[in-house]
């Protein structure tokens, strides 16, 4: 694995039930490759890898990265 990707972690904490965390693949065709559903208070630590180029968060969650902290919102 490329060491460039190994330190790119994202912490996602659900603020309410039903937060979806979706991993998207690299390459010419972007596809879903993993999905998790979090309930209020649950935390997932995700990592960018040679296969994961993006992480989509759907729902109300606190997202922390090395670059800062943000909140996702419900529609």
UniProtKB/Swiss-Prot annotation:
It comes from the Bacteria. InterPro entries: MtrB, Trp_RNA-bd_attenuator-like_dom, Trp_RNA-bd_attenuator_dom. One of its GO terms (biological process) is DNA-templated transcription termination. The keyword Transcription applies. It holds the Pfam family TrpBP. Keywords: RNA-binding, Transcription, Transcription regulation. The keyword ATP-binding does not apply. One of its GO terms (molecular function) is RNA binding. HAMAP family: Trp_attenuator. Belongs to the MtrB family. Oligomer of 11 identical subunits arranged in doughnut-like structure. Required for transcription attenuation control in the Trp operon. This trans-acting factor seems to recognize a 10 bases nucleotide sequence in the Trp leader transcript causing transcription termination. Binds the leader RNA only in presence of L-tryptophan. This is Transcription attenuation protein MtrB. It comes from Bacillus velezensis (strain DSM 23117 / BGSC 10A6 / LMG 26770 / FZB42). The lineage of its organism: Bacteria, Bacillati, Bacillota, Bacilli, Bacillales. The gene is mtrB.
């Amino acid at each position: 694995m490329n060491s460039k990707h190994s330190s790119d972690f994202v912490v996602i904490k659900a603020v309410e039930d039903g937060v979806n965390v979706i991993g998207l693949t690299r390459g010419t065709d972007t596809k879903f490759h993993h999905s998790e559903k979090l309930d209020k208070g649950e935390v997932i630590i995700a990592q960018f890898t040679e296969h994961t180029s993006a992480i989509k968060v759907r729902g109300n969650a606190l997202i922390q990265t090395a670059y800062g902290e943000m909140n996702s919102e419900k529609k």
